[in-house]
């Protein structure tokens, strides 16, 4: 749950056993990304006036589900760069991406620090649609255009057919296999790419698996719980 995740964050940052974030940013409204925010409310953490940044459609869904009470809601517009709180030391930019938008639209978030920047892209449908939307020819071209040093990208599934008899077109994500095919080996000047958001069926969750070893041999990484990135 949220309390466990905040405990992991606090320990990773040397902040004790728990923390309340200075601000919250949301990419979209699918179940695993928003339902936990209710725990910021009076029944659990007792939060009030926490700055929240999301698109207008995400904020609308939160209000309809009565999840917005603990927050001071701020609409983030795609392409605008802003500081979430005064003196926080970093800026954010929301970047529109296509992803099963039945409830709200979906954004990646670029985090811009004093020395480095990071792209947070946990969910999108496929690279073809995303690259067309942002007007770039390849993943590398897109990352170069943003000047990012790190990219935490959608690694939900390793390959097609991973869900057994379930129709995977109903839960579209670019597979890690497809992403690696498009990227090939890491080249000089490439950002550090870290695959995140792995489903429990993904064999790359096992660091000793042949899949995880192959990914590492190309120069890419799988995200690790509690890791930190200095920007």
Task: Report each predicted region and the residues it spans.
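Divalent metal-coordination and catalytic microenvironments
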Residues: 6, 28, 52, 92, ...
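A short, active-site helix/loop in glycosyltransferases that binds the activated sugar's phosphate group
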Residues: 56-67
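Core dinuclear metal-dependent hydrolase active-site scaffold
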Residues: 1-16, 78-140, 144, 225-231
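Structural beta-sheet core signal
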Residues: 24, 52-54, 119-120, 195
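Short glycine-/acidic-enriched loop or helix-start segments at secondary-structure transitions
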Residues: 5-8, 35-37, 63-64, 130-131, ...
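Cap/insert and terminal regions of metallo-dependent hydrolase folds
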Residues: 117, 125-227
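Active-site metal-binding motif and surrounding structural segment of the metallo-beta-lactamase
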Residues: 1-53, 149
């Amino acid at each position: 749950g949220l309390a466990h995740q905040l405990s992991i964050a606090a320990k990773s940052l040397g902040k004790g056993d728990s923390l309340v974030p200075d601000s919250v940013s949301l990419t979209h409204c699918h179940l695993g990304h928003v339902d936990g925010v209710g725990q910021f409310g009076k029944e659990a953490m007792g939060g009030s006036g926490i700055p929240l940044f999301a698109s207008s459609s995400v904020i609308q869904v939160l209000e309809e589900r009565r999840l917005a009470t603990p927050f001071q809601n701020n609409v983030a517009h795609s392409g605008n760069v802003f500081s979430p709180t005064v003196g926080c030391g970093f800026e954010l930019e929301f970047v529109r991406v296509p992803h099963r938008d039945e409830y709200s639209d979906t954004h990646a978030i670029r985090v811009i620090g004093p020395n480095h920047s990071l792209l947070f892209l946990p969910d999108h449908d496929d690279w073809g649609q995303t690259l067309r939307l942002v007007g770039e020819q390849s993943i590398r071209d897109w990352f170069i255009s943003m000047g990012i040093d790190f990219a935490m990208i959608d690694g939900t599934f390793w390959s097609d057919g991973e869900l057994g008899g379930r129709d995977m077109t109903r839960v579209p994500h670019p597979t890690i296999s497809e992403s690696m095919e498009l990227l090939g080996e890491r080249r000089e000047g490439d950002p550090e790419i870290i695959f995140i958001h792995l489903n429990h069926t993904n064999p790359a969750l096992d660091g000793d698996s042949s899949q995880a070893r192959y990914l590492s041999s190309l120069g890419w990484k799988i995200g690790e719980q509690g890791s930190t990135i200095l920007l």
